[in-house]
UniProtKB/Swiss-Prot annotation:
Keyword RNA-binding: yes
Residues covered by the PABC domain: 732-813
Protein source organism: Dictyostelium discoideum (Social amoeba)
SMART domains: RRM (SM00360), RRM_1 (SM00361)
GO biological process, one term: mRNA processing
Homology family: Belongs to the polyadenylate-binding protein type-1 family.
Keywords, sorted A to Z: Cytoplasm, mRNA processing, Nucleus, Repeat, RNA-binding
Main location: cytoplasm
Protein's recorded name: Polyadenylate-binding protein 1-B
Signal sequence bounds: none
One term of GO molecular function: poly(U) RNA binding
Domain of life: Eukaryota
Annotated Basic and acidic residues bias: 1-11
InterPro entries in alphabetical order: Euk_RNA-bind_prot, Nucleotide-bd_a/b_plait_sf, PABP-dom, PABP_HYD_C, PABP_RRM1, RBD_domain_sf, RRM2_I_PABPs, RRM_dom
Length: 814
């Protein structure tokens, strides 16, 4: 039999039925061959199809190619011999290469040739164009025939299956080759946790065996657990449409899967065009029922009922492809019954647009005697028709005095807000702004506070701004002092509206707290009077929790403080040894602007050996010490000595030195500060960290601050000018949740890190290196910006700082 480009169906043996069925399952169009990829795109694993061999007289095989076994089986010719005969004039170096594998195989199977023989015959008229392609194919021929012998004994194909125009059957797995055209993707959601790619392949193969290009189940990167959704890619759009129409909401492991078109462009997913909102749904309405209800009005891109813990929330969303379909659905379905309950269908309104519509008002401070019926009657008679009214009750059914009122018309809601004084309309430079501070109306002779609906971020921002302007931060509280004693003492200076002393699990105070006054003048008076006041065995430190007020009134210990910059330069950074953020990350945002230029003229390098006295500053020279009031307006800090030892002296620290005169001695010769310097110098030279007295404050007498400052100012006037009291170490910016929300991730991290850095400085005597370490630890431990903001705002940051400090003390205590 001679292989031609015509069909072999009349001469097809019985065992060819297998191959013919597989070809019918894939495609029967002759154009499929033309769409096959070039040789460079075909995977290296060959694909075979077996055909009947041609009669021996049709092949003019070179005598050198004939093996002795060929004479015994004249009906079988290896395809590569025919290949040599066709291209003998192109590849003369291939002539006469015997193949032992073909000789053995001819004795066992004298009627078959590999499929590439027929494939090359089809392209014989293109040999000048594909000469290089066929040459590469021939170079791998011996290896391919060896694989052919192994495969033929396990799954032989019938002859005649490679008729003209029929595609070559792929023996590789589905999806091994992706055509160059664009794939069509479907999103498959609401999947069970144990559903994988194999299960989805069995489901979607009902559309067509070779219709699927790939399947990907999305999983958690850490646990590799399924996230409950997957993407199925199809070769063409028709198969994807058929899968969406026939397989949507099919049960997969007991859960109906939700299929929708996958849009990589986020603008198509987030657009509100054609999106409708369906509410007042019965609990039994699921995704499939909602889809069937609206599918007759147009092509649905997505359809979903909101569930919480397996229970329907009573509302859902339907996203149509066009806006006309959505309008038609609203007109026809709104008010219809589903499971005996009328549903409400309306256009979807985004959250941003919802807050712009002022048809709802919030009320609070309502008397217990006022019920919903009284509210509805009074408000509807005075302002307009009411759509709904909600009054919150506690667990015992007692009214909380707050709730929501929804008017049918937006004008009625604006009317009650205007008459109550809740809205403040102001015009500045032609720009009109509307603000709301809450107003009051009377119902049954009793006042009720009325305000507009505000978002959570807006409410928290207003609360934060109001409380920080009137709140004081109290630090260094003795553990034996309770809340009532502090409240009693602070109440002498004004009306207290709130007090919070942070306690541990044993109900003992942690040494800090917050107290709020009704007026800013009262808070200022309490700060002036009680800052440095002795409670028990400790002197408390009082400051405004608002940084703007701290900028003006930072009177800690009766002096304004200055912190010189301490930046690690050269060598390895500190974060390489501690695992935390570098020191200068949070320093660069601190407004420590007023720094004497003489402070940064001489770098300081910690020595590796304490015995290197030649390079150490002499004991007569005051070394940088722990925070103390040396000249009334400046303090410097020393590196943590244990930290320097960890670096083994390899990393230099650029250290600011105290101002010195020509002979190398310090200009500050005040006797009260001399003892402090000597104590700190001794501690530094011995290689230990700076010591603190039990109450956590430096050794100095607070009663001598006035005289010390006068003496210091007199002795240092030739070096620097004392800055005004308004220049302090605290930043000018006030952190708000609105700023954190709108800022970029990097800006929010830097801002919150700087805030934590300042708090650690105030808590641990301006220890710059310790502050940088702890700030880095806390920022890394709480990566969520809003969570860290709440920890800072409610005072929990102090406990986090103490925990970080205890962790730093554990590894290498001396």
């Amino acid at each position: 039999m001679v292989p031609t480009t015509e069909s072999h169906e009349n001469n097809m043996p019985d065992n060819a039925a297998i191959t013919q069925q597989q070809q019918d399952a894939t495609t029967s169009s002759s154009s499929s061959v033309a769409t096959q990829p070039p040789q460079s795109q075909i995977p290296p694993q060959p694909q075979y199809q077996y055909q009947m061999a041609p009669p021996p007289q049709t092949h003019h095989v070179h005598p050198h190619h004939v093996h002795p076994h060929h004479q015994q089986h004249p009906g079988y010719v290896p395809s590569h011999h025919h290949h040599h005969q066709q291209h003998h004039h192109h590849h003369p170096h291939h002539v006469g290469v015997p193949n032992l594998h073909h000789s053995i195989h001819q004795q066992q199977h004298p009627g078959y040739v590999p499929s590439h023989h027929h494939h090359q015959q089809q392209h014989h008229h293109h040999q000048h164009q594909h000469q290089h392609h066929q040459h590469q194919h021939h170079q791998h021929q011996h290896h391919q025939h060896h694989q052919h012998h192994q495969h033929h004994h396990t799954s032989p194909m019938g002859a005649g299956a490679g008729a003209a125009g029929m595609p070559i059957l792929s023996m590789s797995p589905i999806g091994a080759y992706q055509p160059p055209h664009q794939l069509t993707s479907l999103y498959v959601g609401d999947l069970a946790a144990d559903v994988n790619e194999i299960i989805l392949n069995e489901l979607f193969s009902k559309v067509g065996r070779n219709a699927i290009a790939s399947i990907h189940v999305c999983r958690d990167s850490n646990t590799l657990r399924s996230l409950g959704y997957a993407y199925v890619n199809f070769f063409n759009n028709h198969d994807a449409e058929r899968a969406l129409d026939t397989l949507n909401y099919t049960l997969v492991h007991g859960k109906p899967c939700r299929i929708m078109w996958s849009y990589r462009d986020p603008t198509k997913r987030k657009t509100n065009v054609g999106n409708i909102f369906v509410k007042n749904l019965e609990k039994g309405v699921d995704n499939a029922m909602l889809y069937d209800t609206f599918s007759s009005f147009g092509n649905i891109l997505s359809c979903k009922v909101e569930f919480e813990k397996g229970i329907s929330k009573g509302y859902g969303y339907v996203h149509f492809e066009t806006n006309d379909s959505a309008e038609k659905a609203i007109e026809k379905v709104n008010g219809t019954l589903i499971l005996g309950k009328p549903i409400n269908v309306e256009r979807f309104v985004s959250k941003v647009e919802r807050y712009k519509v002022e048809n709802k008002v919030f009320f609070r401070n309502a008397d217990e005697s006022i019920t919903i019926e009284i509210l509805q009657q009074e408000l509807s008679n005075r302002f307009g028709e009411i759509e709904s009214c909600i009054l919150k009750n506690d667990a015992n059914g007692k009214s909380k005095g707050l709730g929501l009122v929804e008017f049918k018309n937006q004008e009625d809601a604006q009317k009650i807000l205007t008459e109550s004084g809740a809205l403040i309309i102001s015009t500045i430079d032609g720009t009109t702004t509307v603000s709301s501070n809450g107003g009051t109306i009377e119902i049954n002779g009793k006042p009720i506070t009325i305000d507009r609906i505000k978002s959570k971020v807006e409410r928290f921002t207003e609360y934060r701004k109001k409380t920080t302007d009137l709140s004081l931060f109290i630090n260094n509280i003795d553990e034996s002092i309770d809340r009532d004693l502090i409240k009693e003492e602070f109440a002498k200076h004004g009306t207290i509206i709130g007090i919070k002393i942070v306690q541990d699990e044993n109900a003992r105070n942690k040494g800090f707290g917050f107290i709020s006054f009704s007026e800013i003048q009262e808070a200022q008076k309490a700060l002036d009077s009680l800052n440095g006041f002795t409670f028990g065995s400790k002197q408390i430190q009082v400051s405004f929790s608002n940084k703007d007020n701290n900028q003006i009134n930072n009177k800690l210990n009766g002096n304004s403080t200055k912190i010189t910059k301490n930046i690690i330069q050269g060598g390895a950074s500190a974060s390489q040894y501690t695992g935390y953020l570098p020191i200068n990350r949070y320093q660069q945002h601190l407004p420590h602007q007023h720094i004497n230029p003489m402070y940064t003229q001489q770098p300081y390098f910690p020595q590796q050996q304490q015995s290197s006295s030649s390079s150490q500053p002499s004991s007569s020279q005051p070394q940088p010490s722990s925070p103390s009031h040396l000249n009334g307006n400046t303090t410097t800090t020393s590196p943590n000595t244990r930290y320097s030892k960890t670096l083994n002296g390899t990393t230099p620290f650029k250290k600011s030195n105290l101002p010195q005169n020509a002979n190398g001695t310090n200009n500050n010769n005040n006797n009260n500060n001399t003892n402090i310097n000597k104590s700190n110098n001794t501690t530094q030279s011995n290689g230990f960290r700076n010591k603190r007295v039990p109450n956590g404050k430096p050794r100095y007498n607070n009663n001598n601050n006035s005289s010390n400052n006068n003496n210091n100012n007199n002795t240092t006037t030739n070096v620097t000018t004392t800055p005004s009291s308004t220049e302090t170490t605290t930043p000018k910016t006030t952190i708000t949740l609105e700023f954190i929300t709108n800022a970029t991730a990097e800006e929010a991290t830097e801002t919150l890190g700087s805030e934590v850095y300042n708090l650690v400085l105030a808590k641990y005597n301006n220890n710059i290196e310790l502050a940088a370490k702890i700030a880095g630890m806390i920022v890394d431990a709480v990566p969520e910006h809003k969570e860290l903001f709440e920890i800072i705002s409610n005072g929990q940051i102090q406990s986090k700082i103490e925990e970080a400090k205890s962790l730093l003390d554990q590894p290498d205590q001396e």
